[in-house]
Amino acid sequence: MSVNRCIYLLSRSHIRYRVCASTNLSTVSTLSTTQHSTRRTFDKLSTRHSSSGSSRPLDTSLFIPLPVKTDEDAEGSVGAELTKPLDKNELLKVLNRFYKRKEMQKLASDQGLDARLFHQAFVSFRKYVLEMNSLNADLHIILNDICCGAGHIDDIFPYFMRHAKQIFPMLDCIDDLRKISDLRVPANWYPEARAIQRKIVFHAGPTNSGKTYHAIKRYLEAKSGVYCGPLKLLAHEIYEKSNAAGVPCDLVTGEERIFVDPEGKPSGHIASTIEMCSVTTPYEVAVIDEIQMIKDPARGWAWTRALLGLCAEEIHVCGEAAAVDFITELMFTTGEEVEVHNYKRLTPFSISNHAVESLDNLKPGDCIVCFSKNDIYSISRQIEIRGLECAVIYGSLPPGTKLAQAKKFNDPDDPCKILVATDAIGMGLNLSIRRIIFNSLVKHSLNEKGEKEVDTISTSQALQIAGRAGRFSSVFKEGEVTTMHRDDLPVLKEILGKPVDPIATAGLHPTAEQIEMFAYHLPQATLSNLIDIFVSLSQVDGLYFVCNIDDFKFLADMIQHIPLNLRSRYVFCTAPINKKQPFVCTSFLKFARQFSRDEPLTFNWVCRQVNWPLSPPKNIKDLVHLEAVHDVLDLYLWLSYRFMDMFPDSNQIREIQKELDENIQIGVRNITRLIRAIDSQPTDTESNSSSTVPESETSQRKGRVLRSQNQRKELPRKSSLSSRLLRDGLLTKELLSQLQKEWAREQNEDNSIPVNNGKRKKK
């Protein structure tokens, strides 16, 4: 929507920013405050619009020159017959003089050739002229005249530009490409939503404040509705809750479709993952959960699409209060007002004044939060040594396994009273946690160059995790938050004491239609190159950013050599796979290759690829492999809903996936036994760590950074399972040494053969 439209809307007296009260709701703004807030929002909006009109400089390094089509034919020798053969040495001098002329460079710049493109075009043109046996008659005659002193060197320019446009076809259509990649008004992409006046209701509050409860209550009351959540687990929860309440509801995720009606007739209510929601189906009520993820660098585009595009009379968004101002600002561009409901936490949580410091101090209802699998393995093992049972939850586990572990932890009759988890517990699972214990406050990540970085968790992340302590519907009405290490506690208090950074922009992503239009103009470009050029040419409003497309490009480059049509290639590249898993990537490549042969990917074919049937895991590496196989089966199911004819056996795949999930659950239930089974043979590794948790986070942090940098340099020479686990990053040297020491002690106590721990040889 244009700024003029905003001015018109603001001039209408009924436009206002309303803050309504609800059960446990907070403040109500006065009229003067509302007008001031509206005026401030409009000032910011006008500034963003005025600053977004100019396009960014074109990154010409993305333009890859195409090979020149030679047009030698019977007419090729006409030029030589009319004049005389060209002297190559003289011709080279003429071409070099042409290249050095500032006037030609300026003229080429006006035609879209910057210094980089001008140089590349000239090198190609010079090679073409010097190596062709016979040139076109007109070019041959012009060059001959210049060599003889009868022509001007500038006469070469039209032929040079003709050649430049052959190797850089985008020069002829750059204006069209800019129009296609203009992302400044994404609201206009959804005409169905713009055709109605929608009511936007923002339910703002922290974790466990009841904000989603009130939105879902309205969803269940409506004649039709759609729930859009960030996780399959959340979509499943709403699907089950809705049907249990007597409201027929279908489930739609990337890998699954469940229709309540036995004949497959769609229900009035749908629970879906955010990427799968329909922006053309009309609804009475739509719920968008975790709206703060609109700023997510990779998935933010899905929340933007849902917020701008859902065709519903009421849009209920749930999320952090830090997103209220931005969502209000964004909705001004569509002429829709925002009604804000502020919620307070139903059960309080407090920050402890003491760190746990030792696993001996654990109590029932404790959840230790780690940010790496290695820490989960280590702590799980140490908890078992103390005679306690623990549940384990981390991101790469299948949803069924996560639910089983959550159920085990929540069951008051189960002896398992401790949970060890990653930040995967931040959303999607209902857990009866009394105390959240941060094992660390730093998280490892990869930057754009693929290098490991260590960052302290943000206030938003810390609050999301800490908010899981104490729950209104659980036995623990009050929650507590602390750290494992004493040095971390003041840092945690500082993090939780800071205000959450307000959201500034929303994510966008190029659509398949936009990429197809690009490909029409640039038929020889690869998909990865098309995406790069699109992002380079794209223009966005100050309210938006283009999401990270590195994963998309990674998959595009992986299957570039496989012959696929553009639409199929695009769909394959949007598949949600973990590129860090080699087995998953290899399977993805096999899927694409089989698809390109127009051969259906049958159940038997898939079983051969994954070596089905698979046994329960005997060690950690087996467990990791089973998780990867589960991801491959998920990939098959995801593709089966996009290419039904080519992936025909989804029901059979789903059956073996359930069996695989059970095997993974067996492995997770016995995770400490799998750790003990890592290697029964001693290795030349120095035993220098104890079974107690180190007190100093500073030394721990330094040690982890050094391990990540030097891990490959210090691998044991022995080609054992332990060395392979170390090489794959599934196990640290310190953890291996510690485990070997513990196994030796246990075997000595049982009067078994002792394990001799050797010392690492000094270099």
UniProtKB/Swiss-Prot annotation:
Catalytic activity as recorded in UniProt? ATP + H2O = ADP + phosphate + H(+)
Q: What is its EC number?
A: 3.6.4.13
Q: Quote one Gene Ontology molecular function term.
A: 3'-5' RNA helicase activity
Q: Where in the cell is it found?
A: Nucleus; Mitochondrion matrix; Mitochondrion matrix, Mitochondrion nucleoid
Q: Where does ATP bind?
A: G205, P206, T207, N208, S209, G210, K211, T212
Q: Where is this region: Disordered?
A: 39-58, 679-721, 742-763
What ranges does the record list as Polar residues composition bias? 680-697
Residues of the Helicase ATP-binding domain:
192-332
Q: Which domain of life is it from?
A: Eukaryota
- Extent of the transit peptide: 1-65
- Pull one GO CC term from this UniProt entry: nucleus
Q: Does the keyword Metal-binding apply?
A: no
What this chain does, per the record?
Answer: Major helicase player in mitochondrial RNA metabolism. Component of the mitochondrial degradosome (mtEXO) complex, that degrades 3' overhang double-stranded RNA with a 3'-to-5' directionality in an ATP-dependent manner. ATPase and ATP-dependent multisubstrate helicase, able to unwind double-stranded (ds) DNA and RNA, and RNA/DNA heteroduplexes in the 5'-to-3' direction. Plays a role in the RNA surveillance system in mitochondria; regulates the stability of mature mRNAs, the removal of aberrantly formed mRNAs and the rapid degradation of non coding processing intermediates.
What family does the database annotate? Belongs to the helicase family.
Q: Tell me what this protein is called.
A: ATP-dependent RNA helicase SUPV3L1, mitochondrial
Encoding gene, per UniProt annotation: supv3l1
